[in-house]
Amino acid sequence: MEYIILIPAYEPDNKLVSLLKKINNKYKVIVVDDGSTNKDVFEAIKDYSYIISYDNNMGKGCALKTGFKYIKENYKNYVVVCMDADGQHDLKDAINLCDYAKENLDTLVIGKRYWDDKTPWSNRTGNKITRYVFKKKTGMSIYDTQSGLRAFSYKLMDYMLSIPGERYEYEMNVLLDLKKNNIKYHEIDIKTIYIGDNSSSHFNAFKDSYKIYKEIIKHSK
């Protein structure tokens, strides 16, 4: 079964180049350029990945689903692992998630980070609040609801494509709809990596958090 690494990327820096060179064509890599204006990084990784590009920034959810559609149309038996472009996911962790998904084809596998005093306060607090609200509204216990490192097999592709949301709220919607669709999930411990002040992230603390909590409240009604 083929492992496919999917990376949505908006204005990435050289950390994406480093990741792709580390992978070094050992696995199939698909990068979705979500309307970036600077193409230098994409030029640097063209020998290490298949790149899908479009002109306007559509959001992470849209980029993920664009990649999913391409994979569904071009592959049959596979496991997809979604990684972020900011260098905060470890390749070994990604492959561990793939290994579990390969043996559990009907399960969404989620990378679970742990936070300590070295973790930025805003990240630590935000994840704790989201975890509490998510459990309160859904009854599901997921420790790391905001983890972008996730893997699943071809059996869940139609589910992943059916989920609404074009930006960061998409990843939360994937979790919110698990229960009503009787889809299993499993969390696996991964490294918690924060590079500098997390400046590579394009997550808007206010705007994107508002959309995420809005979706949680909507699903609980």
Which stretches of residues belong to each language-model region?
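Hydrophobic targeting segments
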Residues: 2-7, 16, 23, 28-32
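Hydrophobic helical membrane-anchoring modules
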Residues: 3-8, 13-18, 163-221
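Hydrophobic/aromatic residues located in beta-strands of well-ordered beta-sheets
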Residues: 5, 29-31, 80, 108-109, ...
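Conserved short acidic donor-positioning loop in nucleotide-sugar-dependent glycosyltransferases
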Residues: 11, 34-36, 58, 67
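A conserved acidic beta->alpha catalytic loop
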Residues: 33-42, 87-88
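Acceptor/aglycone-binding surface of glycosyltransferases and processive sugar-polymer synthases
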Residues: 50, 54-56, 62-70, 91-168, ...
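Short, high-confidence coil segments that cap the C-terminus of an alpha-helix
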Residues: 75-77, 104-107, 183
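Short beta-strand-to-loop acidic/aromatic patch adjacent to the donor-nucleotide binding site
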Residues: 77-88
